[in-house]
Amino acid sequence: MLSVQPDTKPKGCAGCNRKIKDRYLLKALDKYWHEDCLKCACCDCRLGEVGSTLYTKANLILCRRDYLRLFGVTGNCAACSKLIPAFEMVMRAKDNVYHLDCFACQLCNQRFCVGDKFFLKNNMILCQTDYEEGLMKEGYAPQVR
C-alpha cells in the first residue's frame, strides 16, 4: 500500500539512499521513497502516479499490469477462443470468461450495457429478445444472469 506523507524531518530514501528533502514522500513496504525513486522494476513507471497499490514478488517491485503479466493466469475467451492476457479486464458468466468486446449476444451481436439481462443456453450468451424468441419457438429456458 502506498501513502503520500508530508515530510516532517529528512528520511533516507530506500531507492537512492539520499535524504528526502522534498515536500512529499512515499511510504511503501515500511520504507520511505522519493516520488521519482519508487518505480516498477519492469516498465519504470512511477508507482505513486499509477495508483495506491504496488505488488512485490521475487524481490521485484511492480505495477499491477506488470505483476499480472509476469505472474497472472491467462485463459481463453469462451466466445472467440483466443487468449485473454492476465492483465486484461474480462466479463464472466458462470464458469465462462470473455473479452469485453466478445461479451455480446451470440445470435445478433448486441452489446450489453450495465444492468442489461442476458441469458445462457448451452454456454451461448443471448440477449433478452433472442432468448424470448427461442423460448417461444423451442420452449427452452436458459438461466438468467
From Swiss-Prot:
SMART domains documented for this protein: LIM
Gene Ontology biological process terms from the UniProt entry: negative regulation of ERK1 and ERK2 cascade; positive regulation of fat cell differentiation; positive regulation of nuclear receptor-mediated glucocorticoid signaling pathway; positive regulation of peroxisome proliferator activated receptor signaling pathway; positive regulation of transcription by RNA polymerase II
InterPro entries registered for this protein in UniProt: LMO_RBTN_TF (IPR050945), Znf_LIM (IPR001781)
Domain of life, source organism: Eukaryota
Gene3D superfamilies, per the entry: Cysteine Rich Protein (2.10.110.10)
LIM zinc-binding domain sequence ranges: 11-73, 75-137
Cellular-component GO terms for this entry: cytoplasm; nucleus
One Gene Ontology term of the molecular function aspect: DNA-binding transcription factor binding
PROSITE patterns xref list: LIM_DOMAIN_1 (PS00478), LIM_DOMAIN_2 (PS50023)
The protein's name in its UniProt record: LIM domain only protein 3
Record gene name: LMO3
